[in-house]
Structures are given as C-alpha cells and as structure tokens.
C-alpha cells in the first residue's frame, strides 16, 4: 500500500507509489491556456501551458511574500480541525461538465537543480466557493514551501488555511479566496457495481476522465486505526490524489487516494510479476462526517 509522493523509486514499485504530487520539471514553459474550440467540440487541454501558467502565478505570489507557509498549513493540518458546513442543495452535473469545480492543488517548492519555483500538482475540487477538498497527504509535504490552487478557468490562488482535516480519513478542506464557481454536489454512498467517473490530474495529464465501477468497500489501516475505504476500477495514478469520483448523476461519491499493487512473487525484497492494481478511494460519507453534514 502506498501513496504517490513524487519520489523516485524502482520500476517494479511504480504502481505502489504515493498518490500525491507529480513534480514539475526544471525546464521553462511556453505561455498558453486551456483552449475551448466552441460549439459542441470539447475543450482542448494544454498540459504544458497549465503547469507553466500555474508556476508563473505561484512564483509571482511567492516572491511577493503573500502566501501562508507550508509549515503553518501543516501545523493547522496536524490539529485536525473540524468545520460545520451547510452545503446548498444542488443537483449533480455530468462529470465532464463539472470540471469548472475541479482544481489543481500544487505544492510550491524550489528544487536542488535551479533557483526557480516549481509546482508539484495533485487534484482537488470545490465544495464551496472558497473551499477545496483534497487528501491529507497532499498537504502533509514539509519539503514544500506553500500550497497553490489552480481552477479550470486559469485563476491561481494560494491556500489561506486548513479548515478541516483528518489523517484517518486522509482528507483536508482548504480555504481559498471566494471564486464565484459553482461547487460540486455531494451524493450518498454508491453501491458495489455502480458506474463511476473520475476526473483527476495523473502525472500532469490534466483533467483526465476515467470510468469504471465500484469494486468493493473494505476495512484498511490508516493512522494506526481501522477505517472503511472504497475500491474502484477506474484508472488513476500519481497526481490523482484528491480527485473527485462521480456517480451517474454527477454527484461526488468518493475521493481518489491510493493504489495497491498485487505481485505474484517477491524475492530478496524485489517484487515481480505484477498481477493486479487496486485503486482505493475515500468514501463520501467520511467527507460528510468531516464537514458536519
């Protein structure tokens, strides 16, 4: 069992990496933005432009001295605050239409190869105009300097505070300035075999939609405690942490969290013959509990 933390590991361990932040490289990015072709044609995602623009905006804000430090955010995270939210009643939208409320959540840092700021992107989504949900382990990255959020429309904000968190649930709710964006709708527990869609940012493939079914619910160990989790068959990888899992009516029923690789053999600590990859999510019931719903 592992989260993807953006660290280098052996090839045989790839699928059991931590599902947190995918590190942006040191090369410069050309300017650009998400381009919509209009009409019924889909928006065309420019991955290089997204990470480049987010990095430039984060750099500007870091150099201005405005952002809350990651040290302060982690201090808030460790206190595991709770918040009581009264979410407005709303209907879900098709997963592809909900992308306006899906965010890139990225740790901002300086690497050892240059003096520039970089962004290591993971996933998240709006549950209120000023609140973003992601995983606890996405925030718990002390090697980062601060945390930035980019919306689908290109706006970039620095995280102001952690308003709710649970290591056991692997969830964090972050406050950003009000966005004016309609948040996602939360659903109820999806039954086993239910169809689901996931939108996330695996390894900087931004706004990737994958589909599958709820495979099972099970008990797993997290923060030295037993907690229920949901497995799905929709694919995801590093950078997908915090991505919303939608049911067929466009309501969020889970949050992507981790992968677990099943190997047939293990010898001298080396795993071989990968057989299956399990994809684990946080059930929406735990998010509802965290925000007092």
Outline where the language-model segments fall.
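N-terminal activation segment of mature serine protease catalytic domains
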Residues: 29-125, 290-293
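Soluble periplasmic/extracytoplasmic beta-strand elements of cell-envelope proteins
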Residues: 102-106, 122-126, 133, 146-150, ...
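Short, surface-exposed secondary-structure boundary micro-motifs
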Residues: 135-137, 201, 258
């Amino acid at each position: 069992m592992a989260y993807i933390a953006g660290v280098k590991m052996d090839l045989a361990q790839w699928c059991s990496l931590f599902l947190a932040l995918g590190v942006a490289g040191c090369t410069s990015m050309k300017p650009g933005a998400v381009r919509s072709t209009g009409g019924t044609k889909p928006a065309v995602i420019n991955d290089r432009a997204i990470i480049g623009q987010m990095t430039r905006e984060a750099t500007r804000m870091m150099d201005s001295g405005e952002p809350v430090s990651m040290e302060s955010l982690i201090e808030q995270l460790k206190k595991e605050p709770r918040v009581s939210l009264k979410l407005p009643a709303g209907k879900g939208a098709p997963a592809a239409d909900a992308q306006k409320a899906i965010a890139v959540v990225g740790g901002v840092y300086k690497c050892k190869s240059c003096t520039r700021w970089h962004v290591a992107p993971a996933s998240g989504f709006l549950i209120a105009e000023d609140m973003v949900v992601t995983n606890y382990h996405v925030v718990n990255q002390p090697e980062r300097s601060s945390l930035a959020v980019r919306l689908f429309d290109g706006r970039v904000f620095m995280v102001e505070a952690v308003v709710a968190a649970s290591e056991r649930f692997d969830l964090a709710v972050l406050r950003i300035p009000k966005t004016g964006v309609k948040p996602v709708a939360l659903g109820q527990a999806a039954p086993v075999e239910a169809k689901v869609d996931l939108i996330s940012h695996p390894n900087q493939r931004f706004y990737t939609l994958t589909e599958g079914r709820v495979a099972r619910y099970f008990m797993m160990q997290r923060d030295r405690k037993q907690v229920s989790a949901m497995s799905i068959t929709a694919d995801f990888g590093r950078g997908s942490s915090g991505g919303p899992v939608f049911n067929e009516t466009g309501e969020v029923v889970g949050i992507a969290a981790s992968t677990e690789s099943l190997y047939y053999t293990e010898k001298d600590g080396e795993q071989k013959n990968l057989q299956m990859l399990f994809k684990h999510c946080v059930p929406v019931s735990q998010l509802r509990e965290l925000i007092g719903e």
